[in-house]
Amino acid sequence: MPDNRRSQTITQGAQRTPNRAMLRAVGFGDGDFDKPIVGVANGFSTITPCNMGLDTLAKCAEHALKTAGAMPQMFGTITVSDGISMGTEGMKYSLVSREVIADSIETCVQAESMDGVIAIGGCDKNMPGAMIALARLNVPSIFVYGGTIKPGHYQGRDLTIVSAFEAVGQHTAHKIDDHELLEVERHACPGAGSCGGMYTANTMSSAIEAMGMSLPYSSTMAAEDEEKRISAIRSAEVLVDAVKKQILPRSLITRKSIENAVSVVMAVGGSTNAVLHLLAIAHAAEVEFSIDDFEAIRARVPVLCDLKPSGRYVATDLHKAGGIPQVMKMLLVHDLLHGDCLTISGQTIAEVLKDIPEQPRADQDVIQPWDNPVYEQGHLAILKGNLSSEGAVAKISGIKNPSITGPARVFDSEETCMAAILERKIQPGDVVVIRYEGPQGGPGMREMLSPTSALIGEGLGDSVGLITDGRFSGGTYGMVVGHVAPEAFAGGTIALVQEGDSITIDAHRRLLQLNVPEAELERRRAAWHPPAPRYTRGVLAKYAKLVSTASRGAVTD
């Protein structure tokens, strides 16, 4: 079969004279119509520092594709900035953007009969959005991550964007003054790149590398470093070879490779959002994978990396310490990684890792030795109980108290909760409930970084629990439980919680329980009525009608 097996439908034969005429206008010459057409899906944007360097990478890839004998076609896809929209109505569009990104890439590639795809992304939803599209399309594809931001510095300490969120709570609690708050703001984000800790963007780029859909080491490179541009060039070269060999995404995105991705997410201390996104990617690839599979993997994989938000280091430190390949090699040696999984280069995982040392270097402490991990088991626990019969996700790293039973403080939106926190109305021992923020009810399943950061800034991070049918940022830590399913809007038990009810969060027992007699719950359930939709027109209304439960990845198809 020719390398242009898909695009020949628009480039070959007398009937396609008009098609070729238009292609000539965008740069095709007589000798180009037999070449494979490779789409470059570019998430470039000046909306966010995460994506402002992507155009440079896209141009590098474009040039490399031409040199390798392919015809690149550049097209854009959207991004939203989770960090800038955080704590506002705009955050409702964040998870929605994952679907828009996936749909736009799928639409463009299918409409133009492209033979391959390079997807370039930076901010949180770019990665899963692209991967969902590539899994649906199943044409030769590779992902290029825009790279991580370097840490900011102030008064001898490293800063990330989460430092700024936590500074708000510190300021409210009069722990810092106006001047220091402004200085944190000025220094937290020094340039281009995705948020620097093992937050959602770096978590998902690491997961994609673990699945073999991006090049080794590419997930932890700094956005502004030359090696990131070299990686984009190399990715284009590898993709052209994959087009020739017909290495397809669904040969790479398998149950085994998703298990590898989950193992790596656990080992690096990654974001709770990985649960939602990997479920959605599995769904797009038609791979059977459930929320319970995360718990099974968590129980056997240790946390090896001491990374923010609960640890000390950022992604660039992990890169210097050996990157994701070093973490993967340690997992492989201890039979916690499937070495026979294929990668986009045509090599297996075991072949890619062949020359990586079995132990991390002794001159660094970002990656801990196997016999002295940060935590002996994974940090993303699936909690069940009468509050979450379908499951909920807790990040149990960095918490001093693995269980809490306390009175419910109930809020039907993030805004009302945030106001109560800033007015110092939340007390130690409380369990905060933020509901009607789920995929359907929000709609859009907003991230609750502002409330959790404010609690931490006020010194309540270890003494207050928080549960929500919304999500958490990758920057969140503490006694927090998200993705509670069924959600309140769908009549889940979280909708029945009343102010002052006793709630138990127990990470060790993996329990999320409303301590109210079943008869009383049934009485409340009979009296409950779903609220009217918050939106009746536009993209949020469409999304609310289509989206699934969080326990299935909040998918829309």
Swiss-Prot record:
Cofactor binding mode and count: Binds 1 [2Fe-2S] cluster per subunit. This cluster acts as a Lewis acid cofactor.
Biological pathway: Amino-acid biosynthesis; L-isoleucine biosynthesis; L-isoleucine from 2-oxobutanoate: step 3/4; Amino-acid biosynthesis; L-valine biosynthesis; L-valine from pyruvate: step 3/4
Key words, A-Z: 2Fe-2S, Amino-acid biosynthesis, Branched-chain amino acid biosynthesis, Iron, Iron-sulfur, Lyase, Magnesium, Metal-binding
Active site: S473 (proton acceptor)
GO BP, sorted A to Z: isoleucine biosynthetic process; L-valine biosynthetic process
Positions annotated to bind [2Fe-2S] cluster: C50, C123, C195
Residues that bear N6-carboxylysine: K125
EC number: 4.2.1.9
Pfam families from the UniProt entry: ILV_EDD_C, ILVD_EDD_N
Alphabetical list of PROSITE patterns matching this protein: ILVD_EDD_1, ILVD_EDD_2
Catalytic activity: (2R)-2,3-dihydroxy-3-methylbutanoate = 3-methyl-2-oxobutanoate + H2O; (2R,3R)-2,3-dihydroxy-3-methylpentanoate = (S)-3-methyl-2-oxopentanoate + H2O
Positions annotated to bind Mg(2+): D82, D124, K125, E447
Protein function: Functions in the biosynthesis of branched-chain amino acids. Catalyzes the dehydration of (2R,3R)-2,3-dihydroxy-3-methylpentanoate (2,3-dihydroxy-3-methylvalerate) into 2-oxo-3-methylpentanoate (2-oxo-3-methylvalerate) and of (2R)-2,3-dihydroxy-3-methylbutanoate (2,3-dihydroxyisovalerate) into 2-oxo-3-methylbutanoate (2-oxoisovalerate), the penultimate precursor to L-isoleucine and L-valine, respectively.
Family label: Belongs to the IlvD/Edd family.
NCBIfam families on file: ilvD, PRK00911.1
Assembly description: Homodimer.
Name of the protein described by the UniProt record: Dihydroxy-acid dehydratase
Species per Swiss-Prot/TrEMBL record: Nitrosomonas europaea (strain ATCC 19718 / CIP 103999 / KCTC 2705 / NBRC 14298)
Lineage, highest ranks first: Bacteria, Pseudomonadati, Pseudomonadota, Betaproteobacteria, Nitrosomonadales
